[in-house]
Amino acid sequence: MSNSRNNRVMVEGVGARVVRGPDWKWGKQDGGEGHVGTVRSFESPEEVVVVWDNGTAANYRCSGAYDLRILDSAPTGIKHDGTMCDTCRQQPIIGIRWKCAECTNYDLCTVCYHGDKHHLRHRFYRITTPGSERVLLESRRKSKKITARGIFAGARVVRGVDWQWEDQDGGNGRRGKVTEIQDWSASSPHSAAYVLWDNGAKNLYRVGFEGMSDLKCVQDAKGGSFYRDHCPVLGEQNGNRNPGGLQIGDLVNIDLDLEIVQSLQHGHGGWTDGMFETLTTTGTVCGIDEDHDIVVQYPSGNRWTFNPAVLTKANIVRSGDAAQGAEGGTSQFQVGDLVQVCYDLERIKLLQRGHGEWAEAMLPTLGKVGRVQQIYSDSDLKVEVCGTSWTYNPAAVSKVAPAGSAISNASGERLSQLLKKLFETQESGDLNEELVKAAANGDVAKVEDLLKRPDVDVNGQCAGHTAMQAASQNGHVDILKLLLKQNVDVEAEDKDGDRAVHHAAFGDEGAVIEVLHRGSADLNARNKRRQTPLHIAVNKGHLQVVKTLLDFGCHPSLQDSEGDTPLHDAISKKRDDILAVLLEAGADVTITNNNGFNALHHAALRGNPSAMRVLLSKLPRPWIVDEKKDDGYTALHLAALNNHVEVAELLVHQGNANLDIQNVNQQTALHLAVERQHTQIVRLLVRAGAKLDIQDKDGDTPLHEALRHHTLSQLRQLQDMQDVGKVDAAWEPSKNTLIMGLGTQGAEKKSAASIACFLAANGADLSIRNKKGQSPLDLCPDPSLCKALAKCHKEKVSGQVGSRSPSMISNDSETLEECMVCSDMKRDTLFGPCGHIATCSLCSPRVKKCLICKEQVQSRTKIEECVVCSDKKAAVLFQPCGHMCACENCASLMKKCVQCRAVVERRVPFITCCGGKSSEDPSDEISSGNIPVLQKDKDNTNVNADVQKLQQQLQDIKEQTMCPVCLDRLKNMIFLCGHGTCQLCGDRMSECPICRKAIERRILLY
């Protein structure tokens, strides 16, 4: 039976659109929460292969642990015959069927259900496949919605893993825009995307049909929102799973004492007076939230959220089985007992004869659970069920009894021990238990009364917690003051090693921390995970508690068991406000965690630009930006490796990071960016002045890497076209011709080739050889690309990089002055930020990228007459401000720009801005290629920055080693507080000059 079900899931699941599931532990492989993928195939009943819309393909678990949820199974073609969506009229419903539990015969398809059609207060049954068990869901009004992202209308895409449509897209790497999600076939809805390619072509492509993925998104789009917890888990027979073993529809009781329940409810929905009905009434599990807390509905119609540890599952006990437990008697029902009505229609009709008889209106009660309201003299039962009352034969119902066993789940042992302790305490009636409960509830009078009794232990525990800890977490300051007067142990630990100050940080109780500090509590105390209260406050996002702890002298840089400091945690939680507070308090940015990442590394790895901006703005020492990990990676290496462009820009421009640092493999950040084909990072590093000819441990330069990657991609394309291993030796010449031909087929379309050309155009050496004696050109079998590289390099050497344009710009002044688009009007529009002039004002709005340098056009300024003489048109570009407001004669007299008052460092002639060569000093030219304007000054700027860093580093070393009092002698005496001076100054002092603590002992350094 299990095998047939597994086979069915495997067949029916292929093509389903999925999102991450409840047991997901694979980081951002999918692109992040809400990103969508396609089930490609099943490796086994336990493993499924998914291709995410971002192109990542991997195996995931679908048995035992469940990594995926089904967002839409319509592409699989599963249909529910005889049904119709009552909103969009789809007939039959294909995919998941959503049936209203409160309306008669009302169904929705997946799109309409997640699109909030029908009443949001109504609960629905989810029917995943025809004939499968229907699952009752929480109403959508109370459920969490998240946004789906991936290949939807508006997404930018390239060809994907299953592409087989030749060059419809214009060639590998060409992009297109998804205009609509459509049906590949009538039996497979939502399984294709209609794409308009940049070359003008448009067509329909598979996204889910038979598990195929013709597309990969490079820029995802929103696909509407969906109810995450309502989506079925892929591979699971019953979607209502829960670590506590409870499922939607289960009957549950509360068998614990009121005070214990109230204690366990902290952090799990809390307790209100209206919940007293739950102590004597059996409820039905109607939902399981994202924190695995249980939502229970009661006969009154109320719904309450519970900690799973509070609830006991009620099992069905047949009357015959119960009778065996009695001594020769039959099962005796009592008023208030829960009973389940017999499922068998024919049997119950027979049993009801002479016992109230059978009525067709009783049909909905079959299999339902009700409560005994009255027991008649003939033993017949009056049962309240389904909102009405009926008389039943005792033999037609089964008694429902609570199970006596402990809760069984993954963390069951821990919960069982907790409950056992609670029961033991309950039975003993210990005063310590009453004290803890009173402290937790803020009952000052009761606490005062209990503390007067001689046999109470102020440090006694209940459920592993002391009164001090309970009061701290709940913010009961008055009780804390009472306990402190009784010499309570403020450092007492619970089972997790948490002290009262940890509990206060967890509960966001700044006032409690202040009281504990006055009571001499250790604010740097660590629990069993080596976390300080500051760690906990940062992780919970309690900014005021963080500030309070730091104000009272809490150490800002202690490490937990994983080596993370509060800085690491603030970066992970994306709390820039907390990060800034920690840095202002002197948190150490250089401390590394167990993986070797300091705070800068961590922010670069996470791709968190806002955190990086805060870190760089508050760095105590600028050279920290170049700190290496054990493997030699700096923060810039990590940003380049992971294509975090914004982070890399901050490191380069704000942090002045050294661009040429090498890791243990002697690779620079540029090596890594080229190797991973991260074009934007490559452009950023080259323009910032990264050296292009640094060799790694194999002697390879970035240009070697680019050409090797290009050649390998060409070979892979060749292998897709024919089986290379079977080519006969006689065909060898034609094979070489084919390899060469691939280069001419689309060299400029491939990012590796374009990166290689970009490097060559910016001066990369074509002749440098690696340790195998290979030059970059030796790694390129494509003669067309070799010629292009040589041409780019030659143009760079001859200073004509600007002539690398499709139009082959002539230096003829008339040609340079005419608009490159219409050729009718003269050029009169300045593009920013590149500073080129390529079009007239009429054509400029249509230009998105500069026609000379291919940079994105961010601003367009029409060139007016000279603001000084008003006789001629403005013809000189001022740098660095980028304004053109004066003619050649007037511009030569200016020291500052008349428009913005910025100092003029360079003057660029009009002809140079148009892409031509000026007859003036080359130092005044603006490059028309992809080279920064200030190329000449770059080396001097870098040298000055390096000298400044060294000066600051020397000053920092002096501050650490010199006596802070006299500033003349070396520090060679240390006090017990940790500070120090020189011996001469130290011998004359009675208190530390830094912290003002009394000097108890002086220790000389040797």
Curated annotation (Swiss-Prot):
SUPFAM superfamilies: Ankyrin repeat, Mib/herc2 domain-like, RING/U-box. Detected in all tissues tested. Present in embryo, embryonic stem cells, bladder, skeletal muscle, bladder, uterus, testis, stomach, colon, ileum, trachea, lung, aorta, kidney, spleen, liver and vas deferens (at protein level). Highly expressed in testis. Keywords: ANK repeat, Cell membrane, Coiled coil, Cytoplasm, Cytoskeleton, Membrane, Metal-binding, Notch signaling pathway, Phosphoprotein, Repeat, Transferase, Ubl conjugation, Ubl conjugation pathway, Zinc, Zinc-finger. Gene3D superfamilies: 3.30.60.90, Ankyrin repeat-containing domain, SH3 Domains, Zinc/RING finger domain, C3HC4 (zinc finger). Zn(2+) 2 binds at C100, C103, H118, H122. Its EC number is 2.3.2.27. It catalyses: S-ubiquitinyl-[E2 ubiquitin-conjugating enzyme]-L-cysteine + [acceptor protein]-L-lysine = [E2 ubiquitin-conjugating enzyme]-L-cysteine + N(6)-ubiquitinyl-[acceptor protein]-L-lysine. It comes from the Eukaryota. A zinc finger (RING-type) spans 819-854, 866-901, 963-996. Pathway: Protein modification; protein ubiquitination. ANK repeats lie at residues 430-460, 463-492, 496-525, 529-558, 562-591, 595-627, 631-661, 665-694, 698-729. It is found in: Cytoplasm, Cytoskeleton, Microtubule organizing center, Centrosome, Centriolar satellite; Cytoplasm; Cell membrane. Pfam families: Ank, Ank_2, MIB_HERC2, SH3_15, zf-C3HC4_3, ZZ. GO terms for molecular function: ubiquitin-protein transferase activity; zinc ion binding. It is an enzyme of class 2 (transferase). E3 ubiquitin-protein ligase that mediates ubiquitination of Delta receptors, which act as ligands of Notch proteins. Positively regulates the Delta-mediated Notch signaling by ubiquitinating the intracellular domain of Delta, leading to endocytosis of Delta receptors. Involved in ubiquitination of centriolar satellite CEP131, CEP290 and PCM1 proteins and hence inhibits primary cilium formation in proliferating cells. Mediates 'Lys-63'-linked polyubiquitination of TBK1, which probably participates in kinase activation. PANTHER family: E3 UBIQUITIN-PROTEIN LIGASE MIB1, E3 UBIQUITIN-PROTEIN LIGASE MIB2. This is E3 ubiquitin-protein ligase MIB1. The gene is Mib1.
